[in-house]
Amino acid sequence: MPCGGRERGVCPSLDPLILRELFAGSTRFNEIKRGLPLISKTTLAQRLRALEDAGVVDCVDSPGSAYAEYRLTTAGAEFQSVIHALGAWGQRWTSRFDGKNLDAELLMWNVRRRLATDRLPAKRILIRFDFFGLPPRYRKARVFWLILEPPEVDLCLKDPGAEVDLHVSADLETFARVWLGDVALADAMQNKRIQLSGQRELVRRFPSWLLLSHFAGVERPGG
């Protein structure tokens, strides 16, 4: 789809996805790329440069780091309502997924950004996630760790080597449906599609930490 507006400005096919990542808190190139696994690094770099040229994004030095950061300009910030409306439309009108193209790593990257850090205990917590029911090509990526040190939350793909405080075992499709608001977490736990184990207090409080997708509350037709 050709770019609209100013030449090489905002491209309707990709830039809303990039802006979504920036609104979600990603600032560095690799963070943005991690949230957009189907976009090549070359294409992402080209679109970020185009957004800079259009006055939507600024590339700035990151204090104390060799890596640059991407920040929304005042003009870019005004896209927030547009991005939210597009996301709500997609949640309401696009067909439900069939479970064949689920990406556990992408799901966990989004979960990592949607934990209520203000509700977490003031201590370091390690949560291990084990997913089952993965599509064949993703079966190697079935275990993830979240390190919670409020207000920071880090996602690990390798065992951090520390004692696990809370263990989450879940069917991937069920967890994704919970994330999207299609299935209640309490129902998934009752049906044993999601199981929690570990420190009793953490098991009890985990449901209150999981904020779900920004669009989980959007009703679907006939829903």
PLM regions with names:
Residues 1-2, 171:
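Short hydrophobic "helix-edge" motifs at membrane interfaces and signal-peptide entry regions
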Residues 2-39, 70:
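N-terminal helix-turn-helix DNA-binding core of bacterial DNA-binding proteins
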Residues 38-80, 84-223:
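Feature captures hydrophobic
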